[in-house]
């Protein structure tokens, strides 16, 4: 499973971005998100930014990752997934469209 980490861009130099990750400085490749600017949050995986995030999305992902770290250390999730607990599960749009069209088998 791949897990992206939200990081905040401090500076942009071409396709290179200086970031803060868990309080430590780092670098990410911005080739996939050329619209990213200093101050933006991006989802990074293996040294490359994959997506520009809203501050709210970055906070939700950070909370979820923090909850998983707590769980792995023997703690509990707390409210790490509060955004999911307050709603019913949803199908991805393509599966919902198939279900709405009456398709029930693969």
Swiss-Prot record:
Q: Which GO terms describe its molecular function?
A: carbon dioxide binding; iron ion binding
Q: Which InterPro entries match?
A: Hydgase_assmbl_chp_CS (IPR019812), Hydrogenase_HupF/HypC (IPR001109)
Superkingdom as given in the UniProt entry:
Bacteria
Any one biological process term the GO annotation gives: protein maturation
Supply the Pfam families for this chain. HupF_HypC
Give the record's family classification: Belongs to the HupF/HypC family.
Provide the protein name.
Hydrogenase expression/formation protein HupF
Organism field: Rhodobacter capsulatus
């Amino acid at each position: 499973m791949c897990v992206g980490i939200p990081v905040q861009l401090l500076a942009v130099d071409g396709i290179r971005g200086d970031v803060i990750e868990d309080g430590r400085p780092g670098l990410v490749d911005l080739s996939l998100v050329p619209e990213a600017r200093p101050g933006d949050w991006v989802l990074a995986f293996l040294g490359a930014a994959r997506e520009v995030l809203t501050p709210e999305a970055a906070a939700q992902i950070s909370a979820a990752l923090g909850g998983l770290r707590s769980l792995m250390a023997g703690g509990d999730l707390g409210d790490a997934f509060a955004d999911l607990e307050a709603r019913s599960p949803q199908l991805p749009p393509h599966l919902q469209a198939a279900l709405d069209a009456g398709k029930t088998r693969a």
